Design a protein with these regions (language model features):
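Cyclic-nucleotide recognition modules
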Residues: 71-121
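Short, small/polar residue-rich loop motifs at catalytic or cofactor-binding pockets
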Residues: 26-27, 45-47
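Cyclic nucleotide-binding regulatory module and flanking cytosolic helices
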Residues: 1-36, 80-81, 85-90
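Cytochrome P450 core scaffold surrounding the K-helix E-X-X-R motif
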Residues: 61-67
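Short phosphate-coordinating micro-motif centered on Lys-Gly-acidic
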Residues: 39-45
């Protein structure tokens, strides 16, 4: 494994970025580990972070009128989780919990938008 792969391995989802941009991305990110059955976010929570699932499995779900769990989507890392909520500046429309132990990178979306989405380059 080369030094760039070691340094940015968790960010391979963004491998198309230049090294200086990957450094910027790391500066606005926090890596967290979660255990099976922990909650990442609840329906109605504000979408402050872009969530990059590095490893593990999550489920997005809601409840029907009889309070039965309705699974909307399962994701296996690496994957972005409910990123459309960030783009649309909406609160989450579902809950997200972990089906396995997992690692997630939380990217400050406001800073991400300023650094990467609103620049013409």
């Amino acid at each position: 494994m080369d030094s760039i792969s070691k340094k940015y391995g968790d960010y391979k989802y963004f491998s198309f970025l230049e090294e200086k941009d990957l450094d910027k991305l790391k500066d606005i990110s926090i890596k967290k580990t979660y255990k099976k059955d922990e909650i990442l976010f609840y329906k109605g929570d504000e979408s402050k972070y872009l969530h990059l699932l590095v490893s593990g499995i999550v489920k997005l779900y809601t409840h029907d009128f009889k309070d039965n769990e309705v699974v909307i989507h399962n994701l296996i890392g690496p994957a972005l989780i409910a990123e459309i909520m960030n783009y649309e500046e909406m609160d989450f429309l579902a809950n997200c919990s972990f089906d396995t132990d997992a690692e997630v990178i939380l990217i400050d979306y406001k800073k991400f938008k300023e650094e990467f989405l609103q620049k013409p380059e």
